[in-house]
Amino acid sequence: MEHIDLQCHTVASDGELEAKELVDLALKQGLKAIAITDHDSIGSVQKAIEYAKDRGIEIVPGVELSCDDPLFDFDKIDVLGLLTDINNKKLADLIKHINSQRDENKKQIIEKLKGMGYKIEFNDVKMAVKGTFGRPHIAKYLLKKYPEKFSSVADVFDRLIGVGKPAFLETHDRVSIEDGIKAIHGAGGVAILAHPGIYPQKESLKLIDYFLDNGGDGIETYYPYHIICPELKIDERGNEEMIKFYKSIAAKKHVLESGGNDHHGNFRFTLGKIKIPYSVLENIRSRKAL
């Protein structure tokens, strides 16, 4: 059976690999198709498409939009756009707006850190960023500059920039679920709720209903929760049960299924771990064609 992976990240957001490196890795894993779904970025999609030509692998153009909604007390709700037109101006403008807001948030965090005595400048940190600018970039900069103070990136988060810590600031770089779905549809794409199992089950089911009521097309049923979400405390068998549960939800509601391993890099290798049949992509394409 041919397999695919419809959630992959590159250096255009918070992944470790260049587009070319990700394609090579997917080929090594024997995948038939992968989707490039960087967080609030489409910067690697065309590079991957061009490199993959004549190499026997399909590239699905995509994006993972950072959304939220006042009805749900989650830090972020990820919405995948698959088969999107990366040249769509409205989608590009929305992504530009999100990243502008994100940069402003990071400037304010850095000002707080400077006020606490840390020698850090926005432009110095930004220079090392290839994709979207996140708190991990600030943490890596501080770890490199102050190795005697911090033991790891996680240590920087725990002491300074994690939620509720001295230099943390709420970000306003989210769009509403409704606007995210509209932007994806406007770019000719299919809107998928990413990894619904990361939320408490009761809230997850409410979120799925809300997402679908606002025009969403389906949910990500295949996902390696046992690898990416240790806080769930499930093993491989438990993950299989999670997948079955969300597949049953998709079937009951007659909506699309998608699946991705959320690969970011070698620090947490997941590409191709969950076997996702090619038929999943065929079904998504069929729905898009309607």
Predicted region positions:
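An N-terminally biased module of ancient metal coordination in phosphate/nucleic-acid-related enzymes
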Residues: 1-76, 160, 164, 175-268, ...
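Active-site glycine- and acidic-residue-rich loops that bind
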Residues: 128-133, 168-173, 197-202
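Surface-exposed cleft-lining segments at the edges of enzyme active sites
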Residues: 124-128, 157-171
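Active-site phosphate-binding/coordination module
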Residues: 49, 64-100
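Conserved phosphoryl-transfer catalytic core
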Residues: 100-127
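S-adenosyl-L-methionine-dependent methyltransferase catalytic core, i.e., the SAM/SAH-binding region
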Residues: 136, 148-161
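Glycine-rich, often acidic, oxyanion-interacting loops/wings at catalytic, nucleic-acid
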Residues: 133-141
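A broadly conserved amphipathic alpha-helix scaffold signal in soluble, globular proteins
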Residues: 46, 107-114, 140-143, 182
